[in-house]
Amino acid sequence: MKIAVLMGGSSAERDASLENGKRIIAALEEAEHTPVAIDVSEDLVATLRAERPDACIVAVAGKMGEDGTLQSLLDFLGIPYVGSGSEVCRSVADKSLLSAHMQAACDFSGEQTVASWPQGFCFSKVAFDELGAFGAVDLFEDRIPGGYPLAVKPACEGLAYGVHKANDKEELRDALRDAFTFDDKVIVQQWVEGVELSVCILGSGWDAHALPPVEIVPRKGLYLTDARLGSDVVDFYAPVRLESLSHDESTAQAIRSEIERAALEVYRAFGMEGYGCVDLIWDGAQAQVLEVNVTPSLAERSVFSAACEASGLSVPAVLDRLIEE
């Protein structure tokens, strides 16, 4: 099949997107498809209409690729694509909607979820620029359970751009100012410590299944932008090392199952399809969900590739399956 790989784009994640696209193209060739590389620009519609691909794979990271923009356009053009639909992408892209979707899923099913998420608040830039919200920064310590340190992050940005750990009021002010340069909405929430994990998922609905959780260990500092972009500054353990979860093997296995269940709850709550990743932290008592990715990188040094390898799956085989679906 002729598959258009949409890559590049103009977001802060352009370079990562190009690397992801090249990996996907190589995998498609190995799976005996005919890939067409398209660097997303103002000529995209004309290029797609001229190329007439059988389907598309969105490899654009960040805005446009993960917020439903490209997916909506492909819907309008009548071109099938791999992964979740445009409405799902729009919901997933906004991290501030996580708790609402999870609560709705819990109410619908009548069951208590095992997934949890950090408590916090979301503010628009207008509140700080025009309504004087900086004058209430001192209240965050009391309003968010546990107080400092606090996590500050743009609501709709990836690769941890604009994410900060604020240890006091002054750091919080600086973190807010920086985060607002990336997005008009910013989240301030509990800072969660623990085992950092990513659970990649294949399939849709009740047929979706989790691949082995990948443990993420930065060699220095936090797993923020530099660590996510540099393959030589972070180690992936797939599956997660049991000793990282508990010294007792049976307890660790039970925790791993709970982590996988939590990721699947989030995936299904948003109505995701095809493939995706759920990033979370095991804090020693529960799985704290941080964010969801509808277009995870398939680059050679990525959590998705690590999870596939741990499952005995090849990226070409996974892509072939996604295209056929």
Task: Kindly label every feature range from the protein language model.
Residues 248-325:
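ATP-dependent carboxylate activation and anion-phosphoryl transfer catalytic cores
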Residues 36-41, 186, 190, 197-198, ...:
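A short glycine-rich, hydrophobically flanked beta-strand micro-motif that places a catalytic Asp/Glu
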Residues 35, 80-81, 117, 150, ...:
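Hydrophobic beta-strand scaffold residues
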Residues 167-254, 258-261, 282, 288:
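Phosphate-binding site of ATP-dependent enzymes
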Residues 1-97, 101, 105, 124-138:
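ATP-binding N-terminal substructure of ATP-dependent carboxylate-amine bond-forming enzymes
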